Swiss-Prot record:
Keywords of this entry: Carbohydrate metabolism, Cytoplasm, Isomerase, Magnesium, Metal-binding, Xylose metabolism
Organism field: Lactococcus lactis subsp. lactis (strain IL1403) (Streptococcus lactis)
Binding positions (Mg(2+) 1): E232, E268, D296, D339
Recorded consequence of changing D218Y: In strain: 210
Cofactor: how bound: Binds 2 magnesium ions per subunit.
Name of the molecule in the record: Xylose isomerase
Disulfide cross-links: none
Family: Belongs to the xylose isomerase family.
Superkingdom assignment: Bacteria
Consequence of changing T388S: In strain: NRRL B-4449 and IO-1
Originating gene: xylA
UniProt: Mg(2+) 2 binding residues: E268, H271, D307, D309
HAMAP family: Xylose_isom_A (MF_00455)
Length: 439
């Protein structure tokens, strides 16, 4: 059954259009920085926020009008309808990738065995849809935070039985990734951390988390399907202190446990804000360590201190993010997954399409602005000029080429230390000109 017959496929109509159901900036065929927008922006739809989110919150019940959930039948019947609705939305938008948690797509049933069977049935349906539409699986993951058994985490749980149950979920998830041709597999450790250090052996828990990841790698190799593994950092919520706190913390963990050759990072805007970082900072950190894998596209609310997962509309923030992504040479096999939910007051089914249009237009604007910054060498020239003392002075060259010693540097300071001339950063000017690049 079709749920959006009254909405035509979304097309690019430019900024003069008055059509709500049209792209004003995202033109998939437009060439930017040597590639089409569609090639530069591997957009993906998130099954959970798009299809299963009902608008309920701690203060009120469901608000969303979701016709695919109102037709009766079994939970499996509803799951099949959700797949149909999801792919219809993706086709309307021209989005080529999607992502899901295991419990998003299939009912968990009354046992793990029943859950496996439900997943098999629904992924048969997903595979049919993929073949019919050409839409691909960007990544999947296991929800290991909602069920009460995971209240203390999975690999970091104090109960070995919970560790085993989580392994069973990931084992199945990797099998489904192979079945559906997934290019990445995500771990988000929402409850992998500690509530209080008073009763926590942090070192032991992190050792166990590393063992869990190595077991996942071993199993992926055994089934001849080794996707790019992605860790998604977040500092808190739901756990008080999560072990994958931010990009730098996650990278330190991966390096310590010899996981860095298998893992990259899946970075989210709102998670960066929760740490107190900009999204640009997190992307730059990952890029510096050659670990930028994929991103979750959303934004928070500057006035709120939690993960609001709003659709991205802040052009300057996303332009700076796209600048880092372009400097990285793109996202490779990663993509731009809209881990974003419509506000509970945007309750019409059509709002799902309108919200994704807004997000896709924002990233298209950001792409054009970031490409212009790079083409004009606006920021790169400023950065190069700022560090010229390491190229144009004898002492700077000695530091760069490794011939400097503390003795030679001290001798230089004794002779010239009172003559140092500092440079102004002119940061206000830079920020002012940056605004000229916002599309």
């Amino acid at each position: 059954m079709a749920y959006f017959n009254d909405i035509a496929p979304i097309k690019y109509e430019g900024t003069k259009t008055k059509n709500m159901f049209a792209f004003r900036h995202y033109n998939p065929e437009e060439v930017v920085a040597g590639k089409t927008m569609e090639e530069q922006l591997h957009f993906a739809l998130a099954f959970w926020h798009t299809i299963t989110m009902d608008g309920s919150d701690p203060f009120g019940g469901a608000t969303m009008e979701r016709p695919w959930d109102l037709e009766g039948g079994s939970e499996l019947d509803r799951a099949h309808r959700r797949v149909d609705a999801f792919f219809e939305i993706a086709e309307k938008l021209g989005v080529k990738y999607y992502c899901f948690h295991d419990i998003d797509i299939a009912p968990t049933g009354n046992s793990l065995k029943e859950f496996y069977a439900n997943l098999d049935e629904i992924t048969d349906h997903l595979l049919e849809k993929q073949k019919a539409t050409g839409i691909k699986l960007l990544w999947n993951t296991a929800n290991m935070f909602s069920n009460p058994r995971y209240m203390n985490g999975v690999s970091t749980s104090n109960r070995a039985e919970v560790f085993a149950y989580g392994a069973a979920q990931v084992k199945k998830g990797l099998e489904l990734s192979k079945k559906l041709g997934g290019e990445n597999y995500v771990f988000w450790g929402g409850r992998e951390g500690y509530e209080s250090l008073l009763n926590t052996d942090r070192g032991l828990e992190m050792d166990h988390m590393a063992k869990f990841f190595h077991l996942a790698i071993d199993y992926a190799k055994s089934i001849n399907h080794l996707p790019i593994f992605l860790i998604e950092p977040k500092p808190k919520e739901p756990m008080t202190h999560q072990y994958d706190f931010d990009a730098a913390t996650a990278l330190a963990f991966l390096q310590k446990y010899d996981l860095d050759k298998y893992f990259k990072l899946n970075l989210e805007t709102n998670h960066a804000w929760l740490v107190g970082h900009t999204f640009e900072h997190e992307l730059n950190t990952a890029r510096t360590f050659n670990a930028l894998g994929s991103i979750d596209a959303n934004q928070g609310n500057y006035l709120l201190g939690w993960d609001t997962d709003e659709f991205p509309t802040l052009v300057i923030d996303i332009t700076l993010a796209m600048h880092q992504i372009l400097l990285n040479g793109g996202l490779g096999k990663g993509g731009i997954n809209f881990d974003a939910k419509v506000r509970r007051t945007s309750f019409k089914a059509e709002d799902l399409i309108l919200a994704h249009i807004a997000g896709m237009d924002t990233y298209a604007r950001a792409l054009k602005g970031a490409a212009a910054i790079i083409e004009d060498k606006f920021l790169s020239d400023i950065v190069d000029e700022r560090y010229t003392s390491y190229k144009n002075t004898e002492v700077g060259q000695s530091i760069e080429n490794g011939t400097a010693t503390f003795e030679s540097l001290a001798a230089f300071a004794l002779e010239h230390g009172d003559d140092i001339e500092l440079d102004s950063n002119h940061l206000e000017y830079i920020k002012s000109v940056l605004n000229d690049y916002l599309v």
